[in-house]
Amino acid sequence: MPALGSPRRLLGSLNCTPPATLPLTLAPNRTGPQCLEVSIPDGLFLSLGLVSLVENVLVVAAIAKNRNLHSPMYYFICCLAMSDLLVSVSNVLETAVMLLLEAGVLATRAAVVQQLDNVIDVLICSSMVSSLCFLGAIAVDRYISIFYALRYHSVVTLPRAWRIIAAIWVASILTSVLSITYYNHTVVLLCLVGFFIAMLALMAVLYVHMLARACQHARGIARLQKRQRPIHQGFGLKGAATLTILLGVFFLCWGPFFLHLSLIVLCPQHPTCGCIFKNFNLFLALIICNAIVDPLIYAFRSQELRKTLQEVLQCSW
């Protein structure tokens, strides 16, 4: 696939490729001598992918094993793990193929490599879209469980959750196919960036509102126990820290990649933007890191899931 940056990563359809409606190219010497390019070794990509692969396989296995975890909330977490699993599998497959090609162990025609490139691009794009969707679904699920606790089980039913999950997967696959097919059109990049901003805004609004409700609840308990200040401050700090971790990890891991896409549209020839384009592999590595962190934030904090995970590990040995 055409790409202006290094073809090292197979998400080449989005790697610094100026849209067809912007007939611009970025010459290598336009980036200037002061550019900082962070090189990501193949071994590091492979290691990150394998760690993420193991983590998310364990999450899926634990949720599948324990019937107590067969609820809408854990199904959303399981689907998030499956999305991250796609990122990991795509990365491991891509890196392994490239290492074999570079070593001369694997010899194949360019057309075959091109087809493999297309398949991996679709997998990665599908996993990114579905990951963002399931992160939003988890936020909505938690919001309903807090603000509509008495009606939660009538609102978030298993059939409804399955329909939402199916719709997300179908939409993710269709979106990825369209994105890869029409990758050189401005509207595709703008839609992807707009989708990221919408998910970020949704999560921020919901989690901030949940934090405000939690602090209000803590103040009520404090007044009853006549220890208003210590409880409220401690709970508020803990809630703020949790919120910072949730939104901070989301923004730090996904933000640079979507900034990259935005700059492709806004300034494809500017030297400063060219410096950012040169770090495309770093942005993909951050997304893989997000696939590693997601189980720690959303899955492994559950005592029931951790207990099941121990049973899964004991059975595997």
From Swiss-Prot:
> What does the subunit section of this Swiss-Prot or TrEMBL entry state?
Interacts with MGRN1, but does not undergo MGRN1-mediated ubiquitination; this interaction competes with GNAS-binding and thus inhibits agonist-induced cAMP production. Interacts with OPN3; the interaction results in a decrease in MC1R-mediated cAMP signaling and ultimately a decrease in melanin production in melanocytes.
What's the source species for this entry? Answer: Capra hircus (Goat)
Question: Which residues bear S-palmitoyl cysteine-type lipidation?
Answer: C315
GO MF terms listed in the record are: melanocyte-stimulating hormone receptor activity
What broad class describes the main subcellular location of this protein? membrane
Instruction: Give the gene that encodes this protein.
Output: MC1R
UniProt subcellular location? Cell membrane
- SUPFAM superfamilies cross-referenced by the UniProt entry: Family A G protein-coupled receptor-like
Q: Which residues are glycosylated?
A: N29
Query: Which Pfam families does the UniProt entry name for this protein?
Result: 7tm_1
Task: Describe the function of this protein.
Answer: Receptor for MSH (alpha, beta and gamma) and ACTH. The activity of this receptor is mediated by G proteins which activate adenylate cyclase. Mediates melanogenesis, the production of eumelanin (black/brown) and phaeomelanin (red/yellow), via regulation of cAMP signaling in melanocytes.
Single GO cellular component term? plasma membrane
Spell out the family assignment given in the record's similarity comment. Answer: Belongs to the G-protein coupled receptor 1 family.
Segments in the Cytoplasmic topological domain: 64-72, 141-163, 212-240, 301-317
Report the protein name in the record: Melanocyte-stimulating hormone receptor
Segments on the Extracellular face: 1-37, 94-118, 184-191, 267-279
